[in-house]
């Protein structure tokens, strides 16, 4: 018999993605490909796409968590752009990070200037004192 075929030798191990090795949901392989194709640097290290995918996954999870809370507060089960806007603008750090970002169909935060609110009159308090 020739040395070809699958009879002898070791069976090849099942392929394991770099995302699963890193314990991530975001695709490490795709991030690596995009880093190489994007002309950001001549060479890309093996750890760079793992780190970047982890950062992107963390930020996404953080925003979705807050947006889910905003949706629940509005008695909705589906996250819409308005919920994303409320989540980002009410969080100090995310608002700083995404300060120059416009979210389509996001609306604005409800805000009434203090000077526009009706003034409390003193006559109402004096009537109670007598």
UniProtKB/Swiss-Prot annotation:
List Phosphothreonine occurrences by residue: 121
Which residue spans traverse the membrane?
Answer: none
In the record, N6-succinyllysine modifications are located at 10, 96
On this chain, the residues bearing N6-crotonyllysine are 37, 119-120, 126
* GO BP field: heterochromatin formation
N6-(beta-hydroxybutyryl)lysine, modified sites:
37
PTM annotation (N5-methylglutamine): residues? 105
> Family per UniProt?
Belongs to the histone H2A family.
The family database entries (PANTHER family) matched by this protein are listed as: HISTONE H2A
Subunit structure of this entry? Answer: The nucleosome is a histone octamer containing two molecules each of H2A, H2B, H3 and H4 assembled in one H3-H4 heterotetramer and two H2A-H2B heterodimers. The octamer wraps approximately 147 bp of DNA.
- The identity of this protein, by name, is Histone H2A type 1-E
Source organism of the structure: Rattus norvegicus
């Amino acid at each position: 018999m020739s040395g070809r075929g699958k009879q002898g030798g070791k069976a090849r191990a099942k392929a394991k993605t770099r995302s699963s090795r890193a314990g991530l949901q975001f695709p490490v392989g795709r991030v690596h490909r995009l880093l190489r194709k994007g002309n950001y640097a001549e060479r890309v290290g093996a750890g760079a796409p793992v780190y970047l995918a982890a950062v992107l996954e963390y930020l996404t999870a953080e925003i979705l968590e807050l947006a889910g809370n905003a949706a629940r507060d509005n008695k909705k089960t589906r996250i819409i752009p308005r919920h994303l806007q409320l989540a980002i603008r009410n969080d100090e750090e995310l608002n700083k990070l995404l300060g120059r970002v416009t979210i389509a169909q996001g609306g604005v935060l409800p805000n009434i200037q203090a000077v526009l609110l009706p003034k409390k009159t003193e006559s109402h308090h004096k009537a109670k004192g007598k």
